[in-house]
Amino acid sequence: MKLQLALVLCGLTLALGQIVPRSSWCPVPISPRMPRLMVPVRLIIIHHTVTAPCFNPHQCQLVLRQIRADHMRRKFRDIGYNFLIGGDGRIYEGLGFGIRGEHAPRYNSQSIGIAFIGNFQTGLPPSQMLQAARTLIQIAVQRRQVSPNYSVVGHCQTKATACPGIHLLNELKKWPNWRPKP
């Protein structure tokens, strides 16, 4: 009974926007030499990972490790995104707040990168993913990591790419802080 109650409480906490820490999926801490972000930033750039989707913590942790390994092979300093959203509706810490990402070259020093795990050229992310991203943005504003007057753009608005997928981009256009230009 106590275990069930603990699991329910944990689920409620995650549902309220707890960020799953990087240490749950990556044993390597972020290097103290990683460039810092000047916060609050005014720009949130949305991506999709074009990987397999994930629907539970175990699957998502595997995908996160694969993404980080791919980014490291491509000579990134670490995983490129600040946060990732799993198909399980959880918010996974990548670089986290205050660290400059490597997700949109001309905009890394002035933005937070949020990646939806999966490919959204072929369909819309599940509603729990969309809600998790909105929750993360609220947390970022509350923690003064993102300006209250922030803008949301898709990666394709910063360079020639299909990212974050046409279906996710069309959804972003409905969000109140979406802008046609960064």
UniProtKB/Swiss-Prot annotation:
Residues listed as glycosylation sites in the UniProt record: N149
Compartment annotation: Secreted
Site (described: Important for catalytic activity): Y81
Effect recorded for L62S: In strain: ZW141
One Gene Ontology molecular-function label: zinc ion binding
Keywords: Disulfide bond, Glycoprotein, Hydrolase, Immunity, Innate immunity, Metal-binding, Secreted, Signal, Zinc
Primary location: secreted
Catalytic activity: Hydrolyzes the link between N-acetylmuramoyl residues and L-amino acid residues in certain cell-wall glycopeptides
Cofactor(s) this protein cannot do without: Zn(2+)
Function: N-acetylmuramyl-L-alanine amidase involved in innate immunity by degrading bacterial peptidoglycans (PGN). Probably plays a scavenger role by digesting biologically active PGN into biologically inactive fragments. Has no direct bacteriolytic activity.
Name this protein carries in UniProt: Peptidoglycan-recognition protein SB2
The organism of origin for this protein: Drosophila melanogaster (Fruit fly)
